């Protein structure tokens, strides 16, 4: 009996070893967390079906109360029986997967045992199904509660299921004397082994789940700590200063060799190993980062070639690169670099992904705050324009001069002046206005400018009829037209033309303002609309403000597009088309 116990212990060890290997595979861990889904049940049937066949074919032949052999068996003689771990695999399949998994595994195991043959082989098919129903019942209770049986409960169920098998052998046998001899020899070792094996199997599962929970807790703590310390920086936007401050904190708190943050084009910061050639303010040099920006998906590299850095002395051997999003559009990347590619773990990847999600949310919140601030700035500038001494007195002086010459025209200009002030104030208080109202604002502004400088410039409109009700951010066209008048023509007093073109391009509204002025110097063209410039006629801050509002509201696809030559300048943008009629309809429905 002791020999049988040791041989059975070896068989259980094989099953436990396979279980341990499976529980260290991520796919199996995911499957175990989704046991109530049929996809997972089907996979559990396959796995435990294979386990049950291994248990059958690695059994120990028993004849007349003695061990004959422990070899792998395909067929037994008619008087021989077998001691194996079949009940263990059926019982555990039921405790983990529930009744349907256990019943199908039980049928597979029973048919396999029937195929091997021996004395009363059909008995084992019956016992397999009975054991499956009982273990499946207990498993179903725990699946409903999203838990697992305790180790103690599993051990008791394991012993009970083996006792049931012994009962089936005695109940359904054709040779009671043979059955009693067999049960008296194998019962105690198999009951102990089955109980012990079930307990160990559940211990592996429960300990793995506990480790996963502890790892998640540590990851959550790390993510929250990092998020808490980097929170103030990403709220200010994705720029060089905020990126460097955040990267310094990440490098200090994480076990990585280097941290880098980029936008879609340039490296904003790189701190740690490889900083001699991964330099801020330069274009992205790694192929891996470009792939992430293109695909919008997390990428992991375990070799220098996978990173795609072409510097011959680059010390970086591994990397995790995660995209940063703003309003569902890739805005940049967060990169963790390693000089030892063997230490890149799944937890590092999950941590990087979690941080990227939090940083993306902070960037979106920061941008929303920036939009609110920009709108406030626009309102302040609008109010300032109303009391601006130069603009106000120039307009009043022009009207005063016209009162004696052409009182009717002076009256019309006063109306236009009041219209201009009113439109400025109303526009600053709204995120969008109709194109029609924007054009009225432009007309009011131009009438005052043309009164001061008669015949100095001509303006032409090409507006699609279907665009009149389109909603656009206020001051777009006015700022572009005003920019042309102030900067395009210098001291030229005639043959100055401005063309305003508004049309539909698929689902976008295309707005273009073109002049035939002197053009923008080539050294300033790339910075116009992004940074202020030094000029005797202004700083270009209005275009910077406008560009920020456009990209903040609609994304980078709506950024200002500036083309210039010696024959003139064209400033254009694309805005997602939305009709004021549609908005009014939606508001009326929601009331």
From Swiss-Prot:
GO terms for cellular component: plasma membrane. The modification Phosphohistidine is found at residue 390. Gene3D superfamilies: 1.10.1760.20, 3.30.450.40, Histidine kinase-like ATPase, C-terminal domain. The keyword Transferase applies. It is a multi-pass membrane protein. GO terms for molecular function: ATP binding; phosphorelay sensor kinase activity. Its EC number is 2.7.13.3. The keyword Transmembrane helix applies. It is found in: Cell membrane. It comes from the Bacteria. It catalyses: ATP + protein L-histidine = ADP + protein N-phospho-L-histidine. This is Sensor protein LytS. The gene is lytS.
